[in-house]
Amino acid sequence: MTLTPFIVLAHGPSRQKVVEEIEVNAAPDKVWAVIADYCSIKDWNPLITACESDNGSQPESIRIITLENGEQIKEKLIKYDPESYNIQYMMVEPNPNAMPVNTHGATISVKSNDNGGSIVTWKGAFYRSFPGPNPPPDQTDEAGKEIISNLYKSGLETIKSQAEQ
């Protein structure tokens, strides 16, 4: 009997990253005033229709956001730093009907620019929710990136318009 060795390769989701930023013609403190409340996301992101938080903007606070399609996502506040204008959070209960991603974590930060204004950066990383090598078209890495990117861009555009008023 002859045994022939062979290699089995498995390929699942890989970590994806999305970074979006926007320049705002307003000082960082004015921009921060728009986003400072952890649940104010419903006021500056048109893709989010509601937000409920169990403990405001305190670290470990849990918020449940409702998207336009009625689906909800549960997120935990990891870091809240008003002095450096930084909010970090992560998804704690993925909902593939809301977004085809798992383990989404993100940071929103505000920095001053050279013109007296601000740069707002929203960056995140995630794994797609479909675990296997051949995801359906609406659950690919690219689909996840597109949804996250659209979420970030719509929020950043509204932050800009509100802070510049």
Please provide the spans of the model-predicted regions:
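Bacterial N-terminal signal peptides
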Residues: 1-5
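Hydrophobic ligand-binding cavity/cleft-lining segments
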Residues: 6-56
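Stable alpha-helical elements in mature extracytoplasmic
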Residues: 27, 34-37, 73, 144, ...
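Hydrophobic pocket/interface hotspot
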Residues: 30-34, 41, 63, 77, ...
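Sec/Tat-exported extracytoplasmic proteins
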Residues: 35-45, 67, 81-84, 152-163
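Short, hydrophobic/aromatic-rich segments at coil-to-beta transitions
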Residues: 56-64, 82-89
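Hydrophobic-ligand binding "helix-grip"
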Residues: 71-119, 125
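A conserved amphipathic terminal alpha-helix motif
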Residues: 119, 126-165
